[in-house]
């Protein structure tokens, strides 16, 4: 079964974690379980809804898909700690908001406007997953021809390799039903990354 995390954690006073977490391992047990689930191939989907400071930021980063609201931020050291240590005033969102983690670091995959949209996006993510890992690559849809004819590729890709062209137009003529789910479009814009199907198989 997939695991969903709804994350909104402002951290805690470390000497008191023995009274906050069960067992003698503290928060480390949570991160260990994150790693073990990942090793077993269990999908982990995280929604970041607010402040995620220190340990609160580890869990989303370990997850397979991470959604951040515009109000959320993930940091190891918050603005107050930076101000105390380096006498620098920096806004928390400037350190670890969606502009940083979706647009630069890649620690989050998608940004959404608010909590309602975040939960809806996580529901859609869940709905796209199969009931078990075995049928994953053929789950849900049969093979389908592209909506745009592959014969049009000759008019899209120029003979001169120095001439730029729109790669998404090429993808639309190769994948099933011309459906392509682009991932991390704000990072490394010279490369297009995403998920689609070819002959019914996820690629």
Label every PLM stretch briefly:
Residues 2, 21-25, 67-68, 157-166:
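Short low-complexity stretches enriched in small and charged residues
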Residues 16, 40, 70, 125, ...:
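Glutamate identity and glutamate-enriched acidic tracts
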Residues 2, 31-34, 42-43, 189-194, ...:
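Short glycine-rich loop/turn motifs
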Residues 162-203:
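Non-catalytic terminal/interface segments that mediate subunit docking, oligomerization
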Residues 7-134:
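Conserved catalytic cores of soluble enzyme domains
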Residues 19-20, 82-83, 125-126, 145-153, ...:
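Short amphipathic alpha-helical patches
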Residues 110-171:
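Terminal amphipathic helices with adjacent charged low-complexity linkers/tails
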Residues 1-15, 196-203:
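A structural preference for short, pocket-lining loop segments at secondary-structure junctions
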